[in-house]
From Swiss-Prot:
The UniProt record lists the keyword Isomerase: no
Cellular compartments per GO CC: extracellular region
Main location: secreted
GO biological process: neuropeptide signaling pathway
Residues that bear Arginine amide: R10
The protein's role, per its UniProt record: Myoactive peptide. Increases the amplitude and frequency of spontaneous contractions and tonus of hindgut muscle.
Annotated protein name in UniProt: Tachykinin-related peptide 3
Keyword Secreted: yes
Protein modification: Tachykinin-related peptide 3(3-10) occurs in two forms, Rhopr-TRP-3(3-10) has unmodified Met-9 and Ox-Rhopr-TRP-3(3-10) has oxidation at Met-9.
Keywords attached to this entry: Amidation, Neuropeptide, Oxidation, Secreted
Length: 10
């Protein structure tokens, strides 16, 4: 779930 990581960074 790479998308989760992107959202977490933001």
């Amino acid at each position: 779930a790479p998308a989760s990581g992107f959202f977490g960074m933001r």
